[in-house]
């Protein structure tokens, strides 16, 4: 499941990564093929509450189990998820590799358009904010000929989708065991900028009855691959130490939710705590 070579100092030196940084594992691609087969577009075609779950490159490589959990959560709320796996091009775009990011965006849009056509323009949900919101914010400039289609779709993080839909659902919280303890929440920068910092908190409050303490900070300091680089390590840590790390150190509760994969990586590297995705927290409290 995880390539042991990734742990070596030589690998980090070759990639320009600081030696104190951990590297994420790489999942077997067979996981995604199984999800796309098990939650196919065709199987959701006759469902009036079909949704397209767009699985990005970060989730595919680093956290594949999140896909199955998301499908369980969506299913418990009455949706029929169709899994579409395609890299968003976010990493290439952040690195300045525009031709490569454009190719990946074109490929992703083609798969999403095909799914949306079959599913009558069903909502498109993403698990990683930086990836799914690339389509919302940047695909229109990369692919101006697709701008009208993009703007006509409902494309959002799963956090925002649920926050918007929960008022329409009857007794949605019945699908979950209550968790009335405090949850510490850190929201990804893309979400704060393009959606709402309150969406994730609202979902946790409505579905679990949780008390949510949102970390009022700016960037966690990872900023995609920025914090991984050898020359940026000290600055990345200083950014985390401004607000985020002290807040985590003083938090006495059990559950920390961080909505970005880079945010969770930063917390794991610089604290003794593990942060989880919103979907992880909801799944752990499902009434199976």
What are these regions (language model features)?
Residues 1-288:
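Iron-sulfur cluster-binding electron-transfer modules in prokaryotic oxidoreductases
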């Amino acid at each position: 499941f995880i390539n042991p070579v990734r742990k070596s100092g030589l690998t980090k030196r070759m990639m320009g990564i600081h030696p104190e940084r951990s590297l994420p594992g790489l999942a077997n691609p067979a996981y995604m093929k199984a999800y796309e087969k098990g939650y196919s577009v065709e199987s959701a075609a006759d469902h009036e509450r079909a949704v397209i779950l767009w699985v990005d490159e970060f989730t595919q490589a680093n956290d594949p189990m999140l896909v199955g959990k998301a499908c369980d959560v969506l299913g418990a709320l009455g949706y029929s998820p169709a899994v579409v796996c395609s890299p968003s091009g976010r990493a290439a775009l952040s690195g300045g590799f525009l031709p490569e990011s454009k190719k990946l965006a074109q490929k992703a849009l083609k798969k999403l358009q095909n799914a949306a056509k079959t599913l009558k323009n069903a909502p498109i949900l993403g698990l990683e904010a930086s990836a799914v919101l690339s389509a919302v914010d940047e695909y229109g400039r990369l692919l101006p000929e697709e701008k009208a289609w993009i703007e006509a779709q409902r494309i959002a993080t799963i956090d925002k989708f649920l926050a918007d839909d929960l008022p329409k659902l009857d007794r949605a919280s019945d699908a979950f065991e209550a968790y009335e303890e405090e949850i510490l929440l850190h929201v990804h920068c893309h979400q704060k900028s393009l959606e709402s910092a309150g969406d994730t908190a609202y979902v946790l409050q409505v579905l679990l009855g949780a008390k949510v303490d949102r970390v009022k900070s700016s960037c966690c300091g990872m900023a995609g691959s920025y914090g991984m680089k050898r020359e940026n390590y000290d600055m990345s840590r200083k950014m985390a130490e401004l607000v985020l790390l002290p807040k985590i150190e003083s938090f006495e509760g059990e559950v920390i939710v961080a909505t970005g994969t880079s945010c969770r990586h930063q917390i794991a590297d610089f604290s003794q705590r593990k942060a989880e995705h919103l979907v992880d927290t909801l799944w752990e409290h499902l009434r199976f």
